[in-house]
């Protein structure tokens, strides 16, 4: 039976015109337009349901264009340090939490930033807080700070540094407490998986899905898929229908052994052949993810010019090796998603994708925080999707940037308008759990360049890069769908596409987005979330 959704403001891609009505049948949109159209009159002569949208705004279901599902679910159970300002705050927060959780085998924390501890992270700073292992994930997920008990549990004392990572040590070779980049991914992440039961992992993912549905998301793009998470997803899918679509990118770890890296890509190719748009559109392997550099806050993002403190890190991959791995994936029709934050890493990523360029491949670059004007223009020319996370441009977390990279470079960071004006498709994501998963928070910062974390902070980051509300919403819906080849059936309210949409109480004003409220989430024509109205 068809359902007429009427008396709403249905977003069709422009902030100047909205449809007033849609018709949905068998989970698909059959009509978008005015209520007075002959199609509506004809429909009313037969059997139909009618839903009054009460004048609310209806957007396509949000699609988080860059996120980490298992990590988000796990983080919801971890101690947040995001409100801490100093080492003293961190110590007090952990100590108080530990007292209230005596049965936990280890204390897991998240949200630490280097600026909170003057760039330092030693086990000795937190060893006296508790005898149990304490592991603190950095806000950007590129570092894990451990106490001595955690280092012992991880067994890293005699391990060699993995390619692209570092186990920090003192002058005597003793581990000091910090795991950087791939060292965190190779040692800490698998350990968390190994000490968690399947039921705990399933619970974490289900909690993440529930959290996403409550903020209007009907699709997600997972950017660090591995064997552990994939296994859990397959078990969950076998037990129930899930209210979302997931496109995943297999994380490729750097290695001095090229065969090992090729074998990782081959595993992604194998899974892609089995789980793709045709065979498994709601949970599939879309491509590979390669992390080309680190982050600005830790001075590990690869820049064309050194940091103000003299640090000058290399990219995590050589151009030659990156090109070979990308070419291998591209030849098997895998999309390539390249994490690149610093302008040197961004140039290398663009150069690499240019070398394998063919129209329609939809390769993508993640973050693009320090793109040069020249490389910003190249994205559109080469059909590269600009995968952006406006929540990372929140001025409340960028206080250290002028000191690290200078005012000039800091003032033109996150140049999203240049990507858009250059013709690149924008795909908006949160990078959760490194940032809030709520799309409205993301949209607020994208359209105001002001802080959603600290409303008293009146700073504006690179005001010229502000996106219009319609552009930002399109990036969070249609653009994100396009980025993973899902735009043929979702991402916009168009005839023939699935009825995935979110109903909001909201004013069409960037400055009021934080007051907006998700009222309902619909997936394939079924209501999967609702609040009491």
Walk through the language-model features, giving the residues of each.
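Short, charged, surface-exposed secondary-structure boundary motifs
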Residues: 146, 256-260, 264, 396-400, ...
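Ligand-binding beta-strand-loop-alpha-helix segment within the catalytic cores
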Residues: 385
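Divalent metal-binding segments
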Residues: 2-6, 11-266, 286, 290-328, ...
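Hydrophobic membrane-embedded alpha-helices
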Residues: 165-173, 371, 378, 382
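His/Asp/Glu-enriched, well-ordered alpha-helical/loop segment
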Residues: 326-337, 344-363, 367-368, 373-377, ...
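Acidic (Asp/Glu)-rich catalytic clusters
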Residues: 236-240, 272-280, 358, 379-381
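Short, Lys/Arg- and Gly-enriched loop/turn segments at beta-strand edges
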Residues: 508-514
């Amino acid at each position: 039976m068809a359902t007429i959704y009427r008396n709403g403001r249905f977003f069709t891609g422009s902030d100047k015109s909205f449809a007033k009505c849609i018709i949905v049948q068998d989970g698909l949109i059959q009509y978008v337009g005015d209520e007075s159209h002959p199609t509506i009159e004809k429909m009313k002569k037969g059997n139909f349901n009618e839903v009054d949208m009460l004048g609310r705004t209806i957007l396509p279901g949000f699609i988080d264009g860059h996120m980490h599902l298992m990590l988000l679910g796990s983080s919801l159970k971890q101690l947040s340090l995001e409100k801490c300002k100093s080492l003293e705050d961190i110590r007090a927060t952990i100590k108080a939490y530990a007292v209230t959780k005596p049965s936990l085998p280890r204390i897991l924390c998240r949200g630490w930033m280097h600026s909170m501890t003057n760039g330092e992270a030693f086990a000795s700073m937190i060893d006296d807080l508790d005898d149990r292992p304490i592991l603190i994930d950095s806000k950007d997920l590129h570092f894990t700070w451990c106490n001595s008990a955690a280092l012992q549990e991880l067994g890293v004392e005699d391990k060699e540094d993995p390619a692209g990572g570092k186990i920090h040590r003192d002058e005597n070779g003793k581990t000091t407490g910090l795991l950087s980049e791939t060292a965190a991914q190779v040692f800490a992440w698998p350990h968390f998986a190994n000490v968690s039961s399947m039921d705990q992992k399933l619970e974490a993912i289900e909690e993440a899905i529930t959290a996403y549905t409550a903020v209007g998301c009907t699709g997600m793009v997972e950017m660090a898929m591995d064997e552990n998470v994939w296994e859990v997803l397959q078990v969950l899918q076998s037990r129930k229908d899930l209210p979302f679509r997931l496109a995943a990118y297999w994380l490729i770890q750097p290695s001095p052994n090229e065969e090992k890296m090729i074998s990782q890509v081959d595993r992604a190719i194998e899974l892609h052949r089995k789980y793709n748009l045709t065979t498994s559109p709601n949970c599939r392997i879309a491509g590979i993810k390669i992390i080309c550099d680190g982050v600005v806050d830790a001075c590990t993002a690869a820049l064309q010019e050194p940091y103000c403190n003299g640090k000058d890190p290399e990219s995590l991959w050589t151009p030659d090796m990156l090109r070979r791995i990308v070419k291998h994936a591209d030849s098997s029709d895998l999309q390539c998603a390249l994490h690149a934050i610093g302008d040197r890493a961004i140039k290398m990523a663009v150069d690499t994708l240019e070398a394998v360029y063919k129209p329609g491949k939809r390769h993508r670059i993640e973050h693009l925080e320090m793109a040069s004007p020249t490389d910003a223009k190249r994205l559109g020319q080469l059909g590269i999707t600009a995968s952006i996370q406006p929540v990372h441009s929140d001025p409340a977390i960028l206080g250290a940037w002028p000191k690290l990279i200078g005012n000039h470079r800091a003032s033109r960071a996150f140049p999203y308008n240049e990507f858009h004006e250059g013709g690149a498709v924008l795909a908006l994501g949160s990078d959760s759990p490194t940032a809030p998963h709520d799309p409205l928070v993301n949209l607020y910062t994208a359209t105001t360049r002001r802080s959603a974390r600290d409303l008293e902070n009146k700073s504006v980051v690179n005001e010229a890069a502000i996106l219009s509300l319609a552009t930002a919403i399109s990036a969070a819906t249609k653009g994100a769908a396009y980025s993973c080849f899902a735009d043929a059936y979702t991402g916009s309210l168009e005839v023939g596409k699935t009825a995935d949409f979110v109903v909001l109480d909201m004013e069409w004003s960037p400055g009021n987005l934080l007051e907006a409220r998700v009222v309902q989430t619909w997936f394939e024509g079924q209501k999967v979330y609702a609040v009491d109205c």
